[in-house]
Amino acid sequence: TPLFQLERAFPQLNFTDPVELTWAPEFKRFMLVELGTKVHLFANDPKATDTTVLLDLKAAKPEATRVYSFTLHPQFVKNRRAYMVYNYQIDEDKRGGTRVSELQITRELKADLSTEREIITWVGGGHNGCSLRFGPDGMLYISTGDATAPSPPDGLKTGQDISDLLGGILRIDVDARDKGRAYRIPPDNPFVKMPGARGEVW
């Protein structure tokens, strides 16, 4: 007798390359991210047959290649702010970047890309990451990949390098701004006062 048996929770729904599934209490629905640049909402109902497309990034931004994560601001009910992280192609040589952006969600449950505001970017390629989560402290936590191919591992030698943003966890405050930045580096981050280190690294 098997110890467990897998069953489809939503047998009527099909997705392509799903990479993230979260419960969004603000919508009273599940929120699912497809790698191919779409974000869906659907009811917590085994009989659900359709979804609401909250975001179709590639339709609006052809340079976008992948969406990895999508999350709502802790005060979303008041400010309608959401955050996404995606890859984009920089030029015809297919060099890429990874971008975290803020945008507004309309009352009709559509991402308004005209409100997009870039928060932070880093080089893309290979392992890009990434996941976004707000902590109980209200800070935005961002996981980043090492931006290189799997073989050899950590080809850019960035895994233990805190002088860049790659291969780590970042912690930033999106409700305030430092001069020249679209965010604030929290003063209690561990490497803020270390010469040569990126203060965003957590």
Region locations from a protein language model:
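Active-site rim elements
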Residues: 155-159, 196-202
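Peri-membrane helix termini and adjoining interfacial loops of integral membrane proteins
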Residues: 113, 179-189
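Conserved small-residue
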Residues: 174-177, 185, 196
